[in-house]
Swiss-Prot record:
One of its GO terms (biological process) is protein quality control for misfolded or incompletely synthesized proteins. One of its GO terms (molecular function) is ATP binding. Keywords: ATP-binding, Cytoplasm, Hydrolase, Nucleotide-binding, Protease, Serine protease, Stress response. The keyword Cytoplasm applies. Its main location: cytoplasm. This is Lon protease. Transmembrane segments: none annotated.
């Protein structure tokens, strides 16, 4: 009974004793006209009864303004209960038709812009008609009066007596019941007030309370109230029975504990307490540890708890395994870093070709570590395509630093407990992978490789969010594993993450990473990697010596260009392994084999070529332009073909183009039409001919903005009948103002242009910095043109004169077809 004790406390605080309530009840019907209009306020969780106080918390701004106005003017407001708690009452259908008028006794502004009010119920009313529903409910009402029963009748006296008796029993079952409320109940002489008071405190639903409010006959209301009180009494008796049983069980547990302690003492006297020796051994090991006081206190507290438990208890092995983990962790144990920068550089160069940015960053870290001993470990993220050596670089870094190496594969990880650990209460609980890796390494400053960071999933919890604490240099000096439950310092750990793409890494996590991009290898770099690392490794793994087999550079280049298409070298490694195995098989079978593999031997050993290199193709037709494309496995060149045919100005795009590339084509076409005077193109050509733009290799999806200037060059060539210059390629985005914007993937595109035989490249002026990052020996035969506007592209890309047999677009005679071809690129 009286679940809402706050309500009763409010009543006691503001009633000032019974006479105030009696006076309110007697004067309740004064100075109010019948059928008056009244502003309504909906109550979600309770029913206000006449003569009763009730607090309410308001959040709606318009309702708060209304209530403040009523409070300041000392007016009254109608309180009606909502039919449903989970919706806002905005119409008459959402509320009951009978409510209680009220005065606002107190109004408090809360810090979060909400308002809390204290209401005093006065008299009941019935809604006759809703006048308005916005901004708040306004209704015409009629006042309702309770029907007073014959207080001298035997039935009435029996009801009153039963109610008071039942309430007394309820109070006796609840020792915590406030004394003030007991006194208040004993002194209420007005039966209506008594029933309303008890109804307001009933532990029942809002519909039952509304039912009591709507009963105007006091004797009938008392009878219904008595039923609710009797039901509440049965529930209270059952609750008391349960509480008594729980109390008895607790006493039994205490008794059992006392008996177990006696048994333990007897076991000690008999020398049978073998588990005590185990705990003593753990405590002795703990005394040898150099760990923080907080950790030591926790460790000894856990051992004390285990000592009090029976070895057969379910918690005992958990506490022991937890203590063993704490002992096995390398608290304050660090390996000594190799501070010889030259030696570290030699180790990195010996095992990995290229990757200059990563090596430079690592040497910077070592240099600063040499200058200061308190530097926190950086959080590096090696970002690049598969197979470029991101993961294997971790081992080399650990070797160069003279540190332990730990690798955790995050691909497919979907449970944050894998990172942060499980609670000890779970069956089979264990620490997370971070603490487990530290435990296995035996050092608190290993090189910790977090492989495939971009492939974490979040089916259960959010493992990426769990990594935020691990990878934040400001927080990881006190990382708390859920199983370990004490802080562990990860600030000296060198975390290195790897990722193939950044867009799948949450922004908050990416912000904590120092991103180092590793681009795909050039053919020259792949050649050097194959000569120095891959081929010798495969030869050794397959049981051959250097005197048995060698390979010519041209053969390696043949394998790279015709049998692999990747940014890294994984497939190249597999193809070289295949070459070595085939030679090894021939040796065992005593068949003839080449002791040095040349270019001509590759096809006979590996079979037909798998890939054709896209090469520049000379054409005499206008409407053809060469673009540069970026793909996940490197760069390539693509052709744009454009053709005009008799029609009505329709634009057709083909070649499986994405939305961005289609928009680039429309932008180029629109700019061309808007600037016909620039190229001397007659306006009528756009109305008399259909334009078709096509990108060959239609099965391959193409998208990106970098084909903008290539599309424009192809269209300008077609409409002016001036051919694009030989061996010229271009890349760049265009705008409707004719401005050329920078694009990405420049290194891969430029290397692809060189492989294809291109001699000149046109690109945005803002991409000049990207060219400067490419090794000069890789681009020494290329000439670069940097442009800001498409007018410059026309001067650089198109021949000054028209082709032979150039078409005259001013002649509008219908033709079967106007030849003119072209090719496009993607980003």
């Amino acid at each position: 009974m009286f679940k809402n004790m706050t309500l009763l406390g409010t009543l006691i605080e503001h009633s000032d004793g019974l006479p105030l309530l009696e006076t309110n009840m007697k004067n309740m019907h004064k100075d109010h006209n019948q059928d008056a209009s009244l502003t309504l306020l909906a109550s979600k969780y309770n029913v206000l009864f006449p003569g009763i106080y009730m607090p309410m918390t308001l959040e709606n701004a318009s309702i708060i303004r209304l209530v403040k106005k009523v409070y300041e003017t000392g007016g009254i407001i109608g309180i009606v209960a909502q039919k449903k708690e989970d919706v806002e009452a905005t119409s008459a259908q959402d509320i009951f038709t009978i409510g209680t008028t009220a005065r606002i006794l107190k109004l408090i502004n809360l810090p979060d812009e909400r308002v809390r009010i204290l209401l005093q119920g006065e008299e009941k009313f019935q809604i006759e008609d809703v006048i308005a529903e916005t901004p708040y409910l306004l209704a015409s009402i009629s006042r309702l009066k309770d029907k007073t029963s014959n207080t001298q009748s035997k039935h009435f006296k029996a009801v009153v007596s039963s109610i008071k008796e039942t309430v007394a029993k309820l109070i006796s079952l609840q020792p915590e019941f406030p004394t003030e409320i007991k006194l208040l109940l004993d002194n209420i002489n007005d039966f209506n007030l008594l029933t309303y008071f008890l109804a307001s405190g009933l532990d029942t639903d809002i519909k039952s309370k509304q039912k009591l409010l709507e009963i105007h006959d006091s004797k009938k209301r008392g009878t219904v109230l008595l039923k609710y009180l009797l039901k509440d009494l049965e529930v209270s008796k059952l609750r008391k029975k349960i509480q008594d049983k729980v109390h008895t069980d607790i006493e039994q547990l205490q008794h059992d504990f006392y008996i177990r302690r006696q048994i333990k003492v007897l076991q000690e006297e008999l020398g049978e307490n073998e588990f005590e020796d185990e705990i003593d051994e753990l405590r002795a090991e703990g005394e040898k540890k150099q760990w923080p006081k907080e950790v030591a206190d926790y460790f000894y507290k856990a051992l004390d708890k285990a000592e009090r438990l029976s070895p057969n208890s379910a918690d005992y092995p958990v506490l022991i395994s937890h203590a063993e983990l704490m002992l096995e962790l390398p608290w304050s144990v660090y390996t000594t870093d190799n501070m010889d920068l030259k030696m570290a550089k030699k180790v990195l160069d010996t095992e990995h070709y290229g990757l200059e940015k990563v090596k430079e960053r690592l040497l910077e870290y070592l240099a600063v570590r040499k200058l200061t001993q308190n530097m926190k470990g950086p959080i590096l993220c090696l970002y690049g395509p598969p197979g470029v050596g991101k993961t294997s670089l971790g081992k080399s870094i650990a070797k160069a630093l003279n540190r332990k190496y730990v690798k955790v594969s995050l691909g497919g990880l979907h449970d944050e407990a894998e990172i942060r650990g499980h609670r000890k209460t779970y069956v089979g609980a264990m620490p997370g992978r971070i603490i487990k890796g530290i435990q296995n390494s035996g050092s608190s400053n290993p090189v910790f490789m977090l492989d495939e960071l971009d492939k974490i999933t979040d089916l259960r919890g959010d493992p990426a969010a769990a990594l935020l604490e691990v990878l934040d240099p400001e927080q990881n000096q006190a990382f708390v594993d859920t199983f370990l439950e004490v802080p562990y310092d990860l600030s000296k750990v060198l975390f290195i993450a790897t990722a193939n793409q950044l867009d799948t890494i949450p922004p908050a996590l990416r912000d904590r990473l120092e991103i180092i991009e590793i681009n795909g290898y050039t053919i020259e770099e792949k050649l050097q990697i194959a000569k120095k690392y891959l081929f010798p490794k495969q030869r050794k793994e397959n049981g051959l010596k250097a005197t048995d087999l060698s390979i010519h550079d041209t053969a390696i280049v043949k394998v790279i260009e015709s049998y692999t298409r990747e940014s890294g070298v994984r497939e190249l490694d597999r193809k070289l392994a295949s070459l070595v195995r085939k030679v090894g098989k021939a040796m065992v079978l005593e068949e003839p084999y080449p002791k040095k593999i040349h270019k001509e031997d590759v096809i006979s050993l590996l079979g037909i070529e798998l890939f054709d290199q896209e090469m520049y193709q000379q054409t005499h037709l206008p409407g053809v332009a060469i673009g540069l494309a970026w793909t996940p496995v490197g760069g390539d060149i693509l052709f744009i073909e454009a053709i005009l045919s008799a029609g009505k100005g329709k634009l057709t795009l083909s070649g499986q183009l994405g939305d961005v590339m289609k928009e680039s084509a429309m932008t180029a076409f629109t700019y061309l039409k808007a600037n016909t005077n620039l190229l001397g193109i007659p306006d009528k050509v756009f109305e008399s001919y259909d334009l078709h733009i096509h990108l060959p290799a239609g099965a391959v999806p193409k998208d990106g903005p970098s084909a903008g200037i290539t599309l424009f060059a192809a269209l300008a060539s077609l409409y002016t009948q001036r051919k694009v210059k030989d061996k010229v390629a271009m890349t760049g985005e265009i705008t409707l103002r004719g401005k050329v914007l920078p694009v990405g993937g420049i290194k891969e595109k430029i290397l692809a242009a060189k492989r294809a035989g291109i001699k000149e490249v046109i690109l945005s002026k803002e991409n000049k910095k990207d060219i400067q990052e490419i090794k000069q020996k890789d681009i020494q035969d290329l000439k670069f043109h940097y442009v800001e506007f498409v007018e410059e592209v026309i001067q650089l890309a198109l021949q000054p004169s028209k082709v032979e047999a150039a078409k005259d677009w001013s002649i509008t005679k219908k033709r079967k077809q106007q030849p003119g071809i072209g090719h496009v690129s993607t980003l």
